[in-house]
């Protein structure tokens, strides 16, 4: 007699077969354009790449065709992940690996990409079907499972390390578009162990803010270096969920965060512009904070600490480049009249008005110092027995 796990596996296989048969039927009904072997800059209505190739003509990107040589893994095909996958597909990425265990629901329709008739299908298969119709030149690989389980995590690590555009090579980038901290920590652990560069993204529970973050193992802070409170406190986030209560979701915020993420991906892969290490988005004030976070030497992830040690060794071995200071150009070489600028404050007065410089961490300076209090400045006028009239008479004589 078959076990429960075997039955579940068989059900999953049958569901995937049903999805594939529906896709074949749908593909036959729809007219999918033939594959394009080489990107062209020719401006004609039938060329889907003409406006992308215009970036090369305008001097933004040197070699846009290079995008076809990259493989990107997208983990989480929800509000942010599905739009991210769509944008990368339209940009002509070489290969997309999609990971998600969830199914399309009518509750997802407030977000972008998915359509009502896809309800009940797995998100990865529904996404692959739609994306292949958009751009058949892109190679797709889908995995319908939860990466946080032991067996699936092992398979996930195997695919991101061997599922590149050329089989056996690693992917070029992993994009985290998941909506829970457990999955983020799983991706973080895998990338630290493999030394894989990845980008993390997220939208707040109230749907009016979000962020993207580039994580380079050993060089920048990983997700475990500065974890959210729910992770640092070892709280099981499943206990925080309540029946009948869900997080808010806006397609506008999802679209903005997905756009910022893909823009950063393109800049990183194609080498143009400035790649953001961390970029936040606050929709209430239209505020976009940007920063870079250093790796935590006391990080709980041992693979992160190992990557930090390897990065420090590489930096120490790298030859230091001498910085040549340019001499300031003299505006007026001749000073016929011998004019000089003289300060109104002497050096002694300046020292008296300044205080000691405090001991501060490296990189921090003070704008000014506070002078020490003079012990004699607190002296008061001696008391006198003279009357007010006598004092006024003395002042008149002065």
Curated annotation (Swiss-Prot):
Short motif (UFM1-interacting sequence (UIS)): ranges: 330-342
Pfam families according to UniProt: ThiF (PF00899)
Main location: cytoplasm
Annotated binding of Zn(2+), by residue: 222, 225, 299, 304
One Gene Ontology term of the molecular function aspect: zinc ion binding
UniProt motif UFC1-binding sequence (UFC): location: 383-398
InterPro entries given in the database record: D-isomer_DH_CS1, ThiF/MoeB/HesA, ThiF_NAD_FAD-bd, Ubiquitin-activating_enz
Keyword terms: ATP-binding, Cytoplasm, Endoplasmic reticulum, Golgi apparatus, Membrane, Metal-binding, Nucleotide-binding, Nucleus, Ubl conjugation pathway, Zinc
Binding, ATP: 79, 100, 123, 146, 180
Annotated region (Linker), positions in chain: 343-373
Observed phenotype of the null mutant: Morpholino knockdown results in seizure-like behavior and decreases locomotor function.
CDD domains: ThiF_MoeB_HesA_family
Protein function: E1-like enzyme which specifically catalyzes the first step in ufmylation. Activates ufm1 by first adenylating its C-terminal glycine residue with ATP, and thereafter linking this residue to the side chain of a cysteine residue in E1, yielding a ufm1-E1 thioester and free AMP. Activates ufm1 via a trans-binding mechanism, in which ufm1 interacts with distinct sites in both subunits of the uba5 homodimer. Trans-binding also promotes stabilization of the uba5 homodimer, and enhances ATP-binding. Transfer of ufm1 from uba5 to the E2-like enzyme UFC1 also takes place using a trans mechanism.
Subunit structure, as described in the record: Homodimer; homodimerization is required for ufm1 activation. Interacts (via UIS motif) with ufm1; binds ufm1 via a trans-binding mechanism in which ufm1 interacts with distinct sites in both subunits of the uba5 homodimer. Interacts (via C-terminus) with ufc1.
Name recorded for this polypeptide: Ubiquitin-like modifier-activating enzyme 5
Organism for this UniProt entry: Danio rerio (Zebrafish)
Gene field: uba5
